[in-house]
């Protein structure tokens, strides 16, 4: 009961008017001394140099200038002029968006810290769930039971008013919502806030924190409706009569949605969507929906999602956004792996009294394979090999010292070995390692102006020993190379719970 009351109190804290006083009053700087929020906002509370300007002090000075009407009169043929002050629109846009994003993140940080405080087990669990590999152990247990998987590309962009309405459910600050709406509409790239195309990616690149906040708000709303319809329960706990009234139009949309499905599928009701073995995973702007159901059920889910996006978010979804994969006939491209279900036949001899029977069974195993062709193409693009996978030297790194060259190649190899340690088949991973090893040797030989064979004979393995040993330390963990435990580890899958990002291969060029 106490835990429920504490959760209820934290949920109600979202209704406080927190954004307006934080922006317009001076005691915001006292938050810098709060150890709870020090890490998340201290960087924005400081006034930075001209190369990296992002400060709430500057944001507070910019807000009055935004509301001065004479700054908003801009000639149509002058797209580079700044509507916020006549200087650099990109700089001011970035400062205001970053300041707004860090403030609205405060309630979520408080809820998370309150949940993890004093609970070491939950803190460790939360840390492990942040890893990119944390999804694979879950799929390892469930994927083999799936018959169909829907590979879903989350739709975008969302209209600006939809985003403002989503935030209105938990931000009870009219001034803040007006400021947000004003800022969004005045941004010259407002029509592509969450569009990942290169031609319109200015906002997402220069305003990453704000971009992720808006995107996560949109995804959170979409998933909450999805869970609501799956469970046929109340959507988003209503704590006030205003919330209930705001949801009337939403329930009207749901009734209309059910009518559409009733006309399209006369025998289908919302109950048929309840699948006791339905699993949902979201990752990198995509999501997968796995089920043990039939093809008809997955088609119903597909059309349901399309109508949900159209009726609630007013988004048109092209057919290619949802792709259905049948297991085990096809594999799924999931987070850099080709994931599939393989049927391993086995024969069991059973004997009853004088009669013996042979029973043939097919065991479904979860398989993860390294996409060797994609990795070779990526290495070829980075000039480590040609398009056929033949290792070549890296001339750009030839001017570096031997230790730097070995360290760079070793870091790339360790990162790939670390991430693809969960592969069921190690042969492809060994091929990638071979390409990097020989490319390193060719680069060193090019630097010393000798052939690879002469270089290896002269220096033997002294220079490359550090490269190979450092690489194998990741795979061997604490086991020795000759131990049986390491031999089993080398053949099996290993998932790491400390991978929070994928290092860029070319970041050190």
Curated annotation (Swiss-Prot):
Organism field: Eucommia ulmoides (Hardy rubber tree)
Similarity annotation: Belongs to the intron maturase 2 family. MatK subfamily.
Pfam families (alphabetical): Intron_maturas2, MatK_N
GO biological process entries: mRNA processing; RNA splicing; tRNA processing
Gene Ontology cellular component annotations, sorted alphabetically: chloroplast
Protein known as: Maturase K
Keyword terms of this UniProt record: Chloroplast, mRNA processing, Plastid, RNA-binding, tRNA processing
Functional summary from the UniProt entry: Usually encoded in the trnK tRNA gene intron. Probably assists in splicing its own and other chloroplast group II introns.
The keyword RNA-binding is assigned to this record: yes
Database matches in InterPro entries: Domain_X (IPR024937), Maturase_MatK (IPR002866), Maturase_MatK_N (IPR024942)
Major localization listed first in the record, in broad terms: plastid
Signal peptide residues on this chain, from the entry's feature table: none
Subcellular location(s) of the protein: Plastid, Chloroplast
GO molecular function: RNA binding
Acetylation is among the record's keywords: no
């Amino acid at each position: 009961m106490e835990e429920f009351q504490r959760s209820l109190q934290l949920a109600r804290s979202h209704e406080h008017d927190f954004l307006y006083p934080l922006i317009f009053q001076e005691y915001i700087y006292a938050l810098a001394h709060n150890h709870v929020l020090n890490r998340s906002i201290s960087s924005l509370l400081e006034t930075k140099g001209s190369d990296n300007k992002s400060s709430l002090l500057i944001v507070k000075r910019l807000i009055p200038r935004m509301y001065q009407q004479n700054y908003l009169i801009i000639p149509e043929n002058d797209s580079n002029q700044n509507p916020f002050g006549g200087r650099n629109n990109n700089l001011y846009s970035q400062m205001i968006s970053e300041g707004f994003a860090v403030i609205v993140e405060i309630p979520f940080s408080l809820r998370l810290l309150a949940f993890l405080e004093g609970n070491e087990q939950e803190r460790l669990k939360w840390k492990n769930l942040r890893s990119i590999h944390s999804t694979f152990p879950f799929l390892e247990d469930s994927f083999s039971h799936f018959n169909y998987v829907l590979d879903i590309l989350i739709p975008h962009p969302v209209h600006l008013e939809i985003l403002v309405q989503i935030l209105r459910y938990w931000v009870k600050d009219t001034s803040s919502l007006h400021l947000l709406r004003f800022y969004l509409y005045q941004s010259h790239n407002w029509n592509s806030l969450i569009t990942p195309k290169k031609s319109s990616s200015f906002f997402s690149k220069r305003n990453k924190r704000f971009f992720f906040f808006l995107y996560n708000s949109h995804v959170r709303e979409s998933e909450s409706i999805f869970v609501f319809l799956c469970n046929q329960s109340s959507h988003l706990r209503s704590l006030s009569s205003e919330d209930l009234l705001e949801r009337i139009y939403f329930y009207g949309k749901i009734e209309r949605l059910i009518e559409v499905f009733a006309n399209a599928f006369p025998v289908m009701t919302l109950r048929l969507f309840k699948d006791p073995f339905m699993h949902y995973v979201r990752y990198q702007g995509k999501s997968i929906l796995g089920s043990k159901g039939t093809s008809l059920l997955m088609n119903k889910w597909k059309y349901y999602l399309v109508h949900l996006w159209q009726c609630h978010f007013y988004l048109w979804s092209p057919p290619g956004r949802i792709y259905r994969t049948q297991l085990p006939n096809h594999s799924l491209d999931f987070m850099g792996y080709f994931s599939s279900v393989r049927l391993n036949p086995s024969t069991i001899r059973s004997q009853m009294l004088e009669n013996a029977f042979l029973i043939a069974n097919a065991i479904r195993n979860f398989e993860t394979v390294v996409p060797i062709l994609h990795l070779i193409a990526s290495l070829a693009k980075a000039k480590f090999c040609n398009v056929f996978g033949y290792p070549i030297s890296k001339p750009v790194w030839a001017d570096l010292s031997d230790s730097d060259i070995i360290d760079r190649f070793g870091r790339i190899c360790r990162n790939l070995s670390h991430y693809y340690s969960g592969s069921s088949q190690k042969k492809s991973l060994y091929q990638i390692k071979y390409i990097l090893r020989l490319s390193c040797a060719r680069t060193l030989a090019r630097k010393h102006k000798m052939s690879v064979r002469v270089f290896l004979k002269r220096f033997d393995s002294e220079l490359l020993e550090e490269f190979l040993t450092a690489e194998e330390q990741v795979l061997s963990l604490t086991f020795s190379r000759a131990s049986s435990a390491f031999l089993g580890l080398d053949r099996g899958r290993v998932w790491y719970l400390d991978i929070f990002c994928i290092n860029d291969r070319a970041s050190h060029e």
